[in-house]
């Protein structure tokens, strides 16, 4: 694919092109490969020396000469050349590609942030409550709660038929990717975004996941450990990479814009929204999908149980337990700038008007992290939104029943809100779905601001000394805060505003 692309682009414009592959020397280092390639590119540029592509036999060189045309593929020999611009390329399964151009001279690329508002215009939900936004609204309004300590979302033929997935496509995907594809397609449909040849490169996505396709990775590794490396399945191997889900969704929809997978623990779903918002504000896309997806399986149950984080019985937020209800699911959120949203009369669930992501390093194994890290995220998000903390009408938090997580949240909320602001917890309904839950907190907040959820909802008032649960009226909410936390001390906060 790279060979053909180079000829297509450069045959007429740059016939003296030199091409080198560092993988011939260092092997394929998977996720590190792109970074290693970039280091080689920079060294080549600064020293005017192009490293060789090693490993060619005489027969290889003869065959290459017949196809290379005027390009120099650097077979086995380093060459000196006066270099001004060097391109580093990288690709991954599912059609994800990246290119960086390095130059000795200062470039003319300027980052300019636009002043357009960014709206949430579509949602997609796959959860243990069932699939679809309408189903989620019904179940939450009916106060349906988990009845087991490990709960699961499911996708099946009804979902595939609804979104036109053919067997030849969906049989290739593992559960992680299937959940992501279904929620992503619903969000696009809800937003009324139609992918065309004209707009495909202006529509992108950021997939957030804490654990990714870990079940598939485990099963693949277990199989080759027991049966030898030759027993590895070429059919299943593409699903072992974290960005496979985003690649499959891109293939299905035809979206060819920015496509990145964010892996930053349980708050990755909210991080994806922060990054997607920034891409739109920096004029790198008119619309983006921000998603959070994580899987529950027998493998995940064993791993989280080994950490001592699966509850012994069903726990709600602030219950003082030692673990949480383990869950899975996928939440996708469509974001659009105001011009693009207006061009197709999109529904506006809420405006995204501020965010922050922080990290406060903690000791290995520390689940909750530090109060300072969460505090900084909340303060910075409010500052970006241009509001004061006392303008926040409600919080959509991350308490999950595990005492060390819930206590951190209680301390910070008391410090900022003094127990006067209602706190909503989506994990009470769906369990701890990690990245899916952090994105769902934002989706739930948006559904509240838009009036799609019932205006009378359960919420907590929390201090370090006391927690009370009350039914609150959400109809007057104007600004709301959503927060998330991940093992290791990573935090995210997002401010949403009701659309007038």
Model features per residue range: what roles?
Residues 12-15, 68-121, 197-200, 385, ...:
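Flexible, low-complexity linker/loop segments at domain and module junctions
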Residues 1, 14-71, 284-322, 355-369, ...:
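Acyl-CoA/ACP chain-elongation machinery
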Residues 1, 29-32, 166-182, 234-241, ...:
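Active-site pocket-shaping loop/turn-to-helix segments
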